[in-house]
Amino acid sequence: MRKVLVFLKNSKKAFETFKRVERVLKDLNLSYKKFINRKELFKVLKPKDYELFLVIGGDGTFLSAARIASRFGVPLVGVNEGRFGFLTEIKKEEIKKVLPLVLEGRAKLQERLMIDVYLRSRNRLRYLGNYLNDAVISKSSIARIIRTKVFINGEEVLEVFGDGVILSTPTGSTAYALSAGGPIVYPESQNLLFVPICPHTLSNRPLVLPSKFEVKFKVVSENMEAFLTLDGQEGFHLKKGDEVIVKRSRYVCRMYSHPRKSFFGILKEKLRWG
């Protein structure tokens, strides 16, 4: 591995952590380039420019980088400089010992499923992008329930009365979907996860689906505005009749897992699981 792109959060702590990372890169004689601005990165990056995206920040920074790196098939590894760090698995205290193992190719390379999201509004279909975690339709600031029809492979399967709905990837199953009562899905599984948010009907339960299925949500609430949030970072206002279509993306997120920790170990450490 010879060319590394360092993508970091715009914060003082992230810059301090970068100094530690920089020393490791220099010790291994690796060339690197540092980026902070996502838009700038998208403009200058070309396929196969780099062999690794090294992300310094929290899970939000990692999700943002994943949408870019997946387009070029470049693997990522995350160094945590946020509050939680479920995706940015390497702690800053571990940089000197653990990061070289990744850079030398001694860590496991995973392929994580991503989703493509489309919005149909006023008979116009628009592609919104590819995402690693989830698509969430939720109510606006007014404290009323919203009605959302759910279609799976073209068949209307239910109508949810509640605070909204989540369509998650296995990676996203430990994010908002988990808080809403969904199951934890092993991150390399090939599934989609549907989770209703605070449904007003006891029979509306989470559902695990094959990744080849297409899921469509239609907002049917009268005079109620809903909101679509993608990976917790991009948002769109929705009105009655708008449809959100989610399907498996042709892009995948390639990422190195922590060479000394398993997924279950991270669950125990981060979520106190087990």
UniProtKB/Swiss-Prot annotation:
Gene3D superfamilies the UniProt entry points to: Probable inorganic polyphosphate/atp-NAD kinase, domain 1, Probable inorganic polyphosphate/atp-NAD kinase, domain 2
Subcellular location: Cytoplasm
Gene Ontology CC terms, in alphabetical order: cytoplasm
Reactions it catalyzes: NAD(+) + ATP = ADP + NADP(+) + H(+)
Active-site residues annotated for this sequence: 59
Cofactor field: a divalent metal cation
Main subcellular location: cytoplasm
Protein name: NAD kinase
Lineage: Bacteria, Pseudomonadati, Aquificota, Aquificia, Aquificales
Name of the encoding gene: nadK
